Design a protein with these regions (language model features):
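A flexible loop/linker signature enriched in serine peptidases of the S9 family
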Residues: 1-9, 16, 23-29, 39-57, ...
Length: 185
């Protein structure tokens, strides 16, 4: 720790050199998870960010802004080819499962529901994700209730926009620059 906050350090296993600080912020670092090829370490920074440390050059990159409650532990898991990071975070008092693509540098909310989901884990072949959820009730304010394990296939469904979205776009009013809404006064 440094001034009460956790930080990332390296030290030789034989103790022949002093510790060297890699990364420090004015908040705690928790839930570290190393990738399978040992090139990246993902972690939760404070209460609102998922970060990734590149082991080769010790650079740190912010992957996502998300909400994490201080008293809870959150699971972060790399896919077996290390191209994805799955993690759980809080959204509207309920757990949500997110996936970050290292190739696309894009974040996806995989569940996006009013139910509580969490503990994402990839199958060894990379075709499925397992998670736990209570699809019939919320966890807030009375607790999680009975959770079950679910398997989601990781395929590119819905690669085309829905017809209703295309239809709605036809009738969207164009927004003029500098104007965010109509004011008839």
């Amino acid at each position: 720790t440094d001034k009460g906050f956790t930080a990332l350090y390296t030290i030789k296993a034989d103790g022949s050199s002093a510790e060297r600080r890699l990364y420090r912020q004015e908040c705690n670092i928790k839930n570290l998870k190393m990738s399978h090829n040992k090139e990246k370490i993902a972690f939760v920074l404070g209460n609102d960010a998922v970060m990734c440390l590149n082991v080769a050059d010790n650079s740190v990159e912010k992957l996502a802004d998300a909400q994490f409650w201080s008293y809870s532990r959150y699971n972060l898991n790399f896919s077996y080819d290390d191209s994805w990071l799955a993690f759980e975070a809080v959204n509207l008092f309920e757990g949500e499962v997110y996936m970050y693509s290292f190739k696309e540098k894009k974040l996806y909310n995989l569940t996006n529901s009013a139910c509580s989901e969490g503990m994402p884990c990839f199958s060894p072949d990379g075709k499925y994700m397992y998670l736990v959820a209570n699809l019939y009730g919320t966890s807030f304010p009375r607790g999680g209730g009975q959770r079950s394990v679910y398997r989601l296939p990781l395929l590119d469904y819905n690669t085309k926009p829905f017809k209703s979205d295309i239809y709605d776009k036809l009738f969207e009013a164009p927004v003029e620059e500098g104007k965010e809404g109509k004011d008839d006064k």
